[in-house]
Amino acid sequence: MASRTLDFSLDKYQELCEVLAEHYRICTVFEYLSEKPEGNIAIVRHDVDRNIKNALRMAEREHDQGIRSSYYFRYPYTFRPDVLTRIRDLGHEIGYHYEVLSKTNGNFEKAVTLFSSELEEFRKICPITTICMHGSPLSKYNNRDLWSRYDYHSYGIIGEAFLSFEQDNGDLHYLTDTGRTWSGKHSLRDVMRTAPGNGNPEILDTTDDLMGWIAQGSAKKLYLTIHPERWSSNSGEWLVWSALDFGMNLGKKILRRWHS
């Protein structure tokens, strides 16, 4: 039965965390890649594209529920040393949300140099062992293509939040809140190219749909990507982000038609 809590609110996210904790061992990207845990596993990743304060609110709620997850920050847009430190101290993983191919207009040599320098800025604050590409939907460059020419392991990185799972995902189901839905229909680059999940437009639209699907035992291994700005703390904020998501989804639809 659907909850009356407003979808894509922090209260709804707390409900989702409760369902996840009931059915899975929840882990960070680093924990999954380094420990290779067995059983019912849920990886929870946050891409902090905007609204740093909301990321901290989420991290605090997760901590109160005994959950540790991964938070990936963009440089310099969401790079706030005080917030990174606070979230790290709550027990969460901090990662680098890189977008260097987009920033350098596809110049690989400049991009890898920029990657190294931005990574060092993060490491002045806390250890960084995993990275995650930013989708940059308005750019023609796919940031993860950087690793077709270079090896992130040479920078002391054990894994990339897409590529490492595409190489060995088994029965891992990948779902993202991109576009204010769990269906995946608004994702351009936020996809796990070899995962059996990647959303299901017919059954997974709302967070209530997702929670019901989880409760049915539909996936042994689950990988969720969450964007903190999408989960509002009040009705005014919810209306603003709902309108922004509507505009972004429309823009992506135009881009798909343009490139088709």
PLM regions: where:
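Short glycine/serine/threonine-biased micro-segments
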Residues: 93
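Active-site-adjacent beta->alpha loops and helix N-cap segments on the catalytic face
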Residues: 79-82
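Terminal accessory/targeting
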Residues: 1-45, 49-70, 84-90, 101, ...
